[in-house]
């Protein structure tokens, strides 16, 4: 009886493991960090003003989050919009994985207070940035490496 239980458990583990290995090898890529990408359209003539504004907020918060190990990296991309409705700035933040986003407010609210001040100061700064830009959207995307 004991041998039958051991054999049954061994077969079950082997079947589970073979499914796991097969599922891993079927993907044509390996998963990397998760990127939060925000598409920003600055208002006419306001790009430099907006970049100066986020030098404290976005950069300051990102540097602190990176120092604390909450994010892997961050980037700001500046380009020419392809149409009047297109973005010209991408704000990108890389997280190790999706789990790094769990309980985000608990992790990032203290950084916001440290960098921008009390919540009412943060709101005032956000309203002022609204005069400089429009947020066209935000995407959460996974970086992949093709096999």
Predicted regions and their residues:
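Residues that flank catalytic or metal-binding motifs in active/ligand-binding sites
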Residues: 34-36, 87-89, 134
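Short, solvent-exposed mixed-charge patches
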Residues: 146-147
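An amphipathic, aromatic/His-enriched active-site/gating alpha helix that lines ligand/cofactor pockets
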Residues: 26-29, 60, 64-72, 92-142
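Immediate post-signal-peptide N-terminus of mature secreted/exported proteins
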Residues: 24-49
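Bacterial N-terminal signal peptides that target proteins for export
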Residues: 1-9, 13
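Sec/Tat signal peptide C-region and signal peptidase I cleavage site
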Residues: 16-23
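N-terminal, post-signal-peptide region of Sec/Tat-exported proteins
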Residues: 43-90
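Hydrophobic pocket/interface hotspot
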Residues: 38, 50, 91, 101
């Amino acid at each position: 009886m004991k041998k039958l239980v051991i054999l049954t458990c061994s077969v079950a583990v082997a079947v589970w493991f073979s499914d796991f290995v097969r599922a891993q090898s079927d993907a044509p890529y390996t998963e990397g960090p998760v990127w939060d990408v925000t598409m920003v359209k600055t208002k006419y003539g306001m790009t430099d003003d907006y970049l100066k504004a986020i030098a404290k907020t976005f950069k300051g918060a990102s540097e602190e989050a990176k120092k604390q190990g909450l994010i892997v990296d961050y980037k700001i991309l500046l380009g020419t919009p392809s149409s009047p409705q297109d973005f010209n700035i991408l704000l990108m933040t890389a997280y190790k994985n999706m789990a790094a986003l769990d309980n985000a407010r608990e992790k990032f609210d203290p950084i916001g207070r440290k960098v921008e001040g009390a919540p009412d100061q943060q709101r005032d700064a956000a309203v002022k940035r609204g005069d400089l830009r429009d947020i066209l959207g935000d995407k959460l995307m996974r970086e992949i490496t093709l096999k």
